[in-house]
Amino acid sequence: MAAFLYNGERKYSYEVLINTINQHQEYFPLYKAPDLFSYFVNLIKAVVTNSPLVLLDSDLNLSEVPGIEESMVNKPTKLTNYHFSDMTAVLSALRQSTSEITIFTSGTTGQPKKVVHSVDTLTRSVRIGEKYEGKVWAYAYNPTHMAGLQVFFQAFENQNTLVNVFNMQRDEVYEKIAGHRITHISATPTFYRLLLPFEQSYLSVQKVTLGGEKSNNHLYENIHKIFPEAKINNVYASTEAGSLFAAKGDCFQIPAAIRDKFAVVEDELLIHKSLLGKSDSFSFDGDYYHSGDLIEWVDKEEGFFKFKSRKNELINVGGYKVNPGEVEDAINAIEGKIGRAHV
């Protein structure tokens, strides 16, 4: 049976995973996990037994989260007797799950806000089939965040292998890519920038996905040099809505089937409430939610657009609204002068 997870020097097979799930028939509704394997085991237990789960980041300040006290964390709850004979049974239970999973926004622009998702919304973008089997994923996201959950479900539902590279240094990441012959990487543009400079190319990587931040052609060119065999695409996702659409390069297209679920007001992308999770913190403009993402149309009729910045990233300089991301791009474009700049 294939490896499920490589975490540091530890290897966990899918057989070990199933045995661990069956062994202790309890879970933690609110859990700060000591390690990634324990986190995944608890997540899977909740999902396959239709139990609610609140995902807590290790550095989440609970004093900022109403209704949750420290004494409630890591307290086990008994589960109804169950037994899974193999991964087919586990995945069948997952795909029928009625669990509600609570995650929190990062809190970078204020207090963390909780958003409740069904398993259906969390796995909306998962693709299953023979072409997705036998893959090895670099796990580069925080596991309690939306992007981390989506990478997990994509890998898990195809019984792929996950290799933990979250918060690793550049040399460590390259060591994992080479040692495990990683085929798929999904990460923020910041993660890929931290891989620069590079000394060699890695031919095992078949697909590279970027998400969570603005990226640019200069970064795509460098990624292509590091991973010359990889297809590069960009994903638009949010804690509130999950994954919505992908792009090749920096140009997204809203699919025709859901184009009526979006609106743009003063360059800000608005998302229809039917695509969102549930949260008391959501405020709607009619039936639409203000994403805070500023875009520019490339072809409005066909639904093509580029992501410009977050609305709250704009700063006032001498009475003018300035986008730090555009300043960063301009500085990085000065050939031979600047190695890397972050604004």
Predicted features by range, described:
Residues T20-L60, Y139-N142, K321:
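Conserved AMP-binding/adenylate-forming
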Residues S99-R127:
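Conserved AMP-binding A3 loop
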Residues T123-V136, T144-H184:
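Conserved AMP-binding/adenylation subdomain of ANL enzymes
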Residues L196-F252:
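Gly/Ser/Thr-rich phosphate-binding loop
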Residues N81-F104, K131-W137:
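Conserved pre-ATP/AMP-binding loop-to-beta segment of ANL
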Residues M1-E26, V65, K78-N81, H117-D120:
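Conserved AMP-binding/adenylate-forming core of the ANL superfamily
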Residues V264-E296, E302, Y320-V322:
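Conserved ATP/PPi-binding loop(s) of AMP-dependent carboxylate-activating enzymes
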Residues G292-H342:
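AMP-binding/adenylate-forming catalytic core of the ANL superfamily
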